[in-house]
Amino acid sequence: MALPCLLLAQIVPKTKQQLTDSTMLRNNGYDSKRIDTVLVVGPRPLEEQLLDRVRIRPGSNPVLLNGNTFAVLNAIPSIAVDELGNLSLQGKTGVLITINGKQTYLTGTSLVGYLKSIPASSLESIDLMTIPPAKWSAEGAGGVIDIRLKKDVLKGLKGNVFLGASKGRLWKYNNGVSLQYGMKRWSLNSSFSVARSSNYFDVDRKRELAYSENVHYVIGQLNKETNNTQELNGRLGMNYRIDKQSSVELSWNYLRNNYEEIGVYQNDFSADGTLKQSTASTSNLRNPLHRNSINLHYDFAGENKNKALQFDFDYLRYSSIRKQDLKTRTVPFFSDQQEQQQFLHSNNPFSVDLLGIKGDFQRKLSGSFSMEAGFQANRSQRQSYGHYQKGEKEYAMADDDSLENTFKQTEYLEAIYTDFQLKLAEWEIKLGVRAEYAQFQTKIDYIDRNTNGRKQMFNLFPTVFGIYRIAENSGQAVQVAYGRRISRPNYQDLNPSIFFFDPSTSYQGNAQLSAQLSDNMDLKYVHGQKWNIGLSLINHRNYISMVHQLSEQNYTQTYQNIAGVKSAAISMNMGKAIVKNLMLYGFGQIQYIHYKNIPTELNDLLINRGIWSFQGNFMMHLNLPYQMTVNWTNSYRTNVLYAQTVIKPLYEMHLAVNKQFSNALSLALTARDLFHSRVLKREILGQGFNIYSKTVVDSRIIGLNFNYTFGLYKKQKIKQTSIEGEVSRL
């Protein structure tokens, strides 16, 4: 996906000169003449193929100028992100998002709300790294999307106000303000936003199993969930320029997120076609969370920018309390049993404390050779407690010791890395290696058993990048890349506390999960700014995947390690101007993925299956008079395999109309999932059971976004924090 880049040199009067230099031209036999200025008219390339990443420049195309960052990501065909925060890059999941190299410490709807709070006009570029270099954390099998902002200001005040509201079946809004004030040595920045996101889930699920040789058991389930999230985001930052070469910055980030959910669940149990009993459950869930993080950053740049030194000190505190009240009424059929009621109350506090330090050193040794090196050290501690009460009457509940648990884990992570980059004629090569040592101390207390253990792990993560530029002027090049990645278990997925959707449907973490290792290889041909085609190969070991377990009437979702997952994909990006004001962009991918696992003592999952799939994204961008643009997006994918689960084909259509009143003021009208076709149909095939489900969510949304910016911008250097990789595990 890219735009052709046309450059035109134009002579303009000196009175129109802005931030340009006069140029002297001399030809033999002619007098010297001064051209007041040479102005390059036309955009920079929208997509720039660098050695280890693809750089998207939103300012090079009006399709990416209006709205917010969430809308910009949705306008890039190789990226897929929805309102729930599910994200993929080139068809790969497990993607990390960073802002100016810093982790956001957000996932799901909280991440979506934060991206919507960043106006598109503040974006400098977006770096897409399917295989990040050694400098970046090895966390995340799907790669990294680094959003780079125009961050500093000139002397004076710069601010931004954004207002957004949308409605499907339920209302949503996201409003905020950011301010930056710059002085000679000091600069202060702050931002504040409030948001509300609401959704509903209508689920129709059918479970079929044979838990004995002669009985065919069917459970029909209808779920209706409605949730809303009230979110408050705040940031304060202070930067002091020590001298021309060094600066120090202190920043504080705060998040408060209050999640509430009401669920109604109806289950009908039948054996050999005869209805046996029915249950009706009502769940009231509250899950408030708080996050505080502090970062101290030091930056030094040597003369002529031939060397640079950076240090980061970080602290993060994350806490949540999941509380649930579940009421179930059981009605037996054709039985002497009486109608029964059961009440369940659960309280599950969870907390994470992280402390980290990171240092980076860069040195340009010669015109064609440069190197980088650095270190990272983290200590993180997470703990949770599961407390449950049961009873047949709400006022007479007693502790349920069979569900009680305590989980505590301390992790130490130390890492060092180095990168070497060399240019040889048409070749550009980058070699790197990252060494990580991790130590885990885990303590789990159940009513029936206690588990204490210590695990140590050392891994090397090599990276290799090479690009051969066939024709410099045309932009044709061949690129090859290899890298090893790691995906550590999500903290909540280690949490052994049980969450009940209803008495027969639950989710439970797995404290025995191991880290997932992935080997990634990419081969790509780039044909200038018009199109590129690539081959991607991935080999996962101990792949972390959700699995489904069914025993009699009880259905449990949890996570397990799958011994081996292999995938191969061919993908293509393109961008073409059809007429003067009409652009077409596209991304297509054909992929084969295969899962294989043999049961062991700790993992009883048996799976050996693969599937071919196709996905495509197509976008049309139309420029209209009066600085208006229309974006029409279509996406389609065939069956997708996730371990035991096959997700059926899915099609979506989106439309956006943008009006740019000035460089500072814009208004965007958006319509997502116009035909409400985002209906998730799943087929889960397990050992002795089949599950079929259909889920409808609040995906057809009409929104209006207003953005106003005032003040001056100035580019700031990219900074990375020491606690990379932790965001995806919160």
Task: Specify the residue positions occupied by each region the protein language model found.
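N-terminal periplasmic accessory domains that precede
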Residues: 69-72, 111-113, 128, 140-162, ...
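Surface-exposed extracellular loop regions of Gram-negative outer-membrane beta-barrel proteins
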Residues: 148-163, 202, 206, 220, ...
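Short, acidic, small-residue-rich periplasmic hinge/interaction motif at the N-terminus
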Residues: 11-62, 82-84, 90-94, 129-131, ...
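Outer membrane beta-barrel strand-and-loop segments of large Gram-negative receptors
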Residues: 354-358, 401-404, 514, 520, ...
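Outer-membrane beta-barrel signature, preferentially recognizing the C-terminal barrel domain
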Residues: 405-411, 486-535, 539, 557-569, ...
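Extracytoplasmic beta-strand/coil segments of soluble accessory domains associated
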Residues: 47, 70-107
